[in-house]
Amino acid sequence: MVHWSAEEKQLITGLWGKVNVEECGAEALARLLIVYPWTQRFFSSFGNLSSPTAIIGNPKVPPHGRKFFTSFGEPVKNLDNIKNTYAKLSELHCEKLQVEPENFRLLGDILIIVLASHFARDFTPACQFPWQKLVSVVAHALPRKYH
C-alpha cells in the first residue's frame, strides 16, 4: 500500500478538479497513438490512424480518450485503494485485450505531459511529484492480473 500525505492528496485532487476529461482525454490518446505508433494495434477498430492528422481527426479517438481519463479519475477518488479500484480493468486488459504492461507506463507519461501542458502554472515540480507517484502506482496496479 502506498502512503499519501495530505498535501499530496490535495495536489492531486485539486488539479484533477480542473481537468476537462473530454479535451485532455482526446489529446492524451492522440498523443499516445502518434508518439508510440505500435499502440495503434490495440485500436484497429478505429479505422484510419495512418498519420498524426488522421489520428487527431479520427472521431473514435475523443470518446475513447474521455473514457481513459474518466477511468483515471477513479484512483484519484480512491487513492488508498488503487489496486482494487482497477481490478476489473486489469482483468480486461490482461485477458481480453492482452495489452503489454509497459504500455500503462507510457500512458502515464502521456497523462503527465497533457496535465503539464494544460495546467503549466499549477503543475509545479511539487505538484508533479505526487502525480508521477500516482501514475506509477496505476501502472503497477493495472497489470496486476497478468500471469
Swiss-Prot record:
The encoding gene: HBE
GO biological process: hydrogen peroxide catabolic process
Molecular function per GO: haptoglobin binding; heme binding; metal ion binding; organic acid binding; oxygen binding; oxygen carrier activity; peroxidase activity
Tissue: Red blood cells.
Domain Globin positions: 3-147
PROSITE patterns linked to this entry: GLOBIN (PS01033)
The keyword Zinc appears for this protein: no
Lineage: superkingdom: Eukaryota
The keyword Transferase is annotated on this UniProt entry: no
Full protein name: Hemoglobin subunit epsilon
InterPro entries: Globin (IPR000971), Globin-like_sf (IPR009050), Globin/Proto (IPR012292), Hemoglobin_b (IPR002337), Hemoglobin_oxygen_transport (IPR050056)
Matches recorded under Gene3D superfamilies: Globins
GO cellular component annotations of the record: blood microparticle; haptoglobin-hemoglobin complex; hemoglobin complex
Binding site for heme b: H64, H93
Subunit structure: Heterotetramer of two epsilon chains and two alpha chains.
Pfam families per record: Globin
Species: Cairina moschata
